[in-house]
Every structure is written in structure tokens, then in C-alpha cells.
């Protein structure tokens, strides 16, 4: 009888496991299909484009051959011939990333802690900091440029683009501060939710020991959200090569603001949809492939540094 009961139990368990398996596969099927189509297939096509050229006569792309097979990759290192400074693009992109990490992450953690502790006007700060993430970026750009920067420029007697003149020394710092501000929302949301996972007993123990708010943040809360901070920083490395700092919203084509351009702005501007940019697609694919290789290497290096720091 025991064997019969055991066999029946195994059949029930088998049916249950099959149902669980069917539910699991049905659940992950759509994301897997999306990953295959929009990542693997799209990127595979980008890799192929790196070894192609646009033929104006046939209005299509044809493969390069012979000595010209790697022509697009050699053109990547000759962007100066297009009136652009590759070194300047890299420098601006790295400065943008460093400032975003340094002056974006730290204030975001502080504001998140303030909201988490539910101090005075915390709801207002939560709304105010997250608002830029809800409003369309082009609307924010219009308001910022048309009603704030232009107003100050007129007061100072500046003409043209005023403080946002791409040839001036004020454009890049102003746009950098603006971008950091509108980027607060997502970080504050994630850090606040991560802080909510910290055990309340730890906070209470710290308060009983007489810890100040600063010590609660640095010794109790911050260690609990360190993995989230690390993830944000590592993921943001890819932004070095994709972040355009909303420059396209302000200036449009990259040749209107070459001195403050970033790698992301360059790629976005040169690969913007339209027949006039078809000729740029192979070069941008090769450029993106080079950036991907550097980004993968940088991610591994930073991740390894974090692991050493944790030890």
C-alpha cells in the first residue's frame, strides 16, 4: 500500500511540475522573443553593416571586399576629416559620465535618504525631483531654453544663443547641470525603494545608540543599498557611448555644436532616420562596434574594482 501511495504522489508531483514548466515557459516566451528580435537580430545586422557601404545607384547596401573590407573601421579613427575631433568626443563623454556619477549619485542618495526618513516637505521633494522623468524631454528643453536661459542671456546683453552658444565656455557646464538635474528622478525612485528594504530594527538600534542622521546614512542605510549603487554605476558605463546629454534637442545636427558634442550625440545625429543619412549607417555601425568592445572591457574592469573594494 505504501508503494501505491508513493506512486500516486509521484504522478501528482509530475503533473504539478509539468504545469509549472508550461506556465514558466509561457511566461518567459515573449521576453525571449523580444530579446532575439530586438537585440540579437538587430545587432547582428549592425555587425554586417560594419562591412558594407551604401550604393546610391542601387539605393541599397553592398558588402566591401579586398583591401576595403575594414574601411569603415579605419574611417572611425579619421573623424577629423569630417570636421569632428574624436578626442574631444571621448573627453566630453567621459566628463559627462564622471560628473553624472559624482554629482548625480551622491545628491540622489542624500535626497533619497531625506525622503526615506520622511522629513519636512519630503512629498514635495519627491514630486519635484521625479517630475522631469514624467514630462517629455523636448518640452522641458523648450521651457529651460526659452524661459530661463534666454531670459538670463537678455539680461546679460548676450545675442544669438546667449549662454548656450556652442562656441562659448558656458554652454557645456549649463547643459551638464541641466542634465544631472533631470536625471535625478529615476535614481531617487530606485534608491528610495532600496532603502525601504533596510530592516527598521537596524534604524531603531542606531537611534538607540545615539547615531546622528549622517551616521545612520553612512553606517546603516548606505551599506544596505550598496549593491543598487554599484549596479547603477556599472550600467551607466554604457552611457559613455550612448548618452547625448539631450544636445539634439537643443542644437539638432551635430555640426552646429561640434565642440561640446558627445559620442552619443554624434551617433544619434549621424544615424538619425532619413535618406540623407543612409551613407552614414555603415560608419556608425563600425563606430558602435568599437564602442561596444571598449564598453565591455570597461564594465569588467569597474566590476573587478568594486569586488576588490568589497573585500
Which positions does each model-derived feature cover?
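A structural signal for multi-pass alpha-helical bundles of membrane permease subunits
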Residues: 16-311
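Short, Lys/Arg-rich, polar N-terminal cytosolic tail immediately upstream
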Residues: 1-18
